[in-house]
Every structure is written in structure tokens, then in C-alpha cells.
């Protein structure tokens, strides 16, 4: 980014308890519209988010006819989980990579999260969660349902196509501005940075 405006806004918002909670509520509302979360605490938000995500996993499992038990994996051992957990790990890794690139290109700090804290990619996880249930989870289940013999490679291809179809970078840029910038503007400088990351024409 050619300006520090978003980073300054992010820093101001995350260091104030009231504004941090306000952004966290806005993130929840973007993921699950139609719910009134205006009075929920951070702990209540996390609890409700967890319940909604578990329900989403069960729904996608039914859609693809795949048995779903629970999220069970070892971050340092990709092949330790079953096929579905490996697929979910690969899909979320792809999503995190793209979101991280956008966050950095916009000049934001990957570490200053609102819901997630204490990690050098906390804000990346916050933003990625906006799209995980929509993009990453279905891609993972779809690959497993196809009886793939190369989970990692097939999930990467599925995520490439899903992120392209969803215009993820464009949406991510807009959503970060919406969350951090009270003016809700997308400067030309920011958009140039994003276009340079990924040519949507496939080049």
C-alpha cells in the first residue's frame, strides 16, 4: 500500500475495547446476516460463531454425502488426519495464503486481530473466517466426495477455481475497507496493489 491509513485505523480500533468489539460484531454480521449481535460480548460472539460453524459443517456434509465427525488435525503433520481433515487443512491453508497477501498489500498488520489474538496472523484468520464456510469448507468436502487419490493437489486446484469464481481478492479488499475505514473507500492505490497480486485473466 502507498498509504498507512488502514494500518493506523486498524491499530486504533484494535487497541480500544469498545471499537474492537464493534468490529468483531461487524465481522459476525457479515458472515451470518440477520442476527442481532449488538449486545453480545466477545465470549458470546465466539460461542455463537462456533455453533453456527459446526452447523454449517454438518449441512455441507449432508449436501455432499460425506460423513463428518469433528475437526481433528495436527498442524505440523498434514497426513495425520483422515481425508476430510486433510482436505480442510489444505483448503484453509490456501485461503489463508491469499488473504494474507491481500492484508499485507493493503498495508494492514497481519497480527492485529479483533476476534483472534496472540498470533502473528490473527487478523488474517479474522478476515479468512469471513469466507471459510462459503469457499473453503465446500471445496474440501467436494474433493473428498469425489474420492480423490491426491487430496492436497486436488484441493489446491478446487480452491484456485473457487476463489477465482468468488472474486475473493476484490471482495477481501472491499471488506477490509468496510471494517476498518469509516469512509468505506477503496483507494486506487490499494486496488493497484491487489491487481498486481493476481491476474484474474489467468496469466
Task: List the model feature ranges, each with a label.
Residues 1-203:
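Active-site helix-to-loop segments that bind/position phosphate- or nucleotide-bearing substrates
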Amino acid at each position: 500500500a502507498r498509504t498507512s491509513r488502514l494500518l493506523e485505523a486498524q491499530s486504533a480500533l484494535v487497541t480500544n475495547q469498545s471499537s474492537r468489539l464493534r468490529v468483531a460484531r461487524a465481522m459476525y454480521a457479515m458472515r451470518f446476516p440477520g442476527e442481532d449481535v449488538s449486545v453480545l460480548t466477545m465470549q458470546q460472539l465466539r460461542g455463537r460463531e462456533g455453533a453456527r460453524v459446526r452447523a454449517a459443517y454438518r449441512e455441507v456434509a449432508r449436501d455432499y454425502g460425506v460423513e463428518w465427525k469433528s475437526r481433528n488435525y495436527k498442524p505440523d503433520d498434514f497426513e495425520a488426519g483422515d481425508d476430510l481433515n486433510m482436505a480442510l487443512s489444505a483448503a484453509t491453508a490456501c485461503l489463508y495464503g491469499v488473504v494474507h497477501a491481500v492484508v499485507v498489500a493493503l498495508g494492514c498488520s497481519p497480527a492485529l486481530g479483533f476476534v483472534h489474538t496472540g498470533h502473528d496472523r490473527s487478523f488474517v484468520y479474522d478476515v479468512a473466517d469471513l469466507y471459510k464456510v462459503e469457499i473453503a469448507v465446500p471445496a474440501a468436502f467436494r474433493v473428498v466426495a469425489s474420492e480423490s487419490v491426491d487430496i492436497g493437489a486436488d484441493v489446491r486446484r478446487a480452491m484456485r477455481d473457487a476463489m477465482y469464481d468468488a472474486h475473493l481478492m476484490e471482495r477481501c479488499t472491499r471488506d477490509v475497507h468496510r471494517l476498518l475505514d469509516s469512509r468505506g473507500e477503496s483507494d486506487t492505490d490499494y486496488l493497484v496493489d491487489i491487481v498486481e497480486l493476481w491476474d484474474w485473466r489467468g496469466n
